[in-house]
Amino acid sequence: MGRDIEKLRALFLKFYASVPDKLREDIIALVDDKTYSWNSTFVEVNGKTALGDKILKKLEQIGLFEEG
């Protein structure tokens, strides 16, 4: 844990590219009592927003980027 935000961004974009279109509306994160789908997370992460960074940290915390 604790990877830098650019590394997390790159990992998320790699994961996102492999998610089938039909699953991209599925919720993947809950941040500040709001839910975020793959698509809404992509918009924030790709736009390099503060919210996107916060979502990436949450996804790392729940183990989305674990290898193996």
Model-flagged regions — what are they?
Residues 2-6:
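Inter-domain helical "communication" segments and dimerization helices
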Residues 11-14, 64:
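Intrinsic disorder/low-structure terminal segments
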Residues 13-44:
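Short amphipathic alpha-helical interface segments
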Residues 46-61:
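Short amphipathic alpha-helical interaction segments
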Residues 60-68:
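A short, conserved structural fragment
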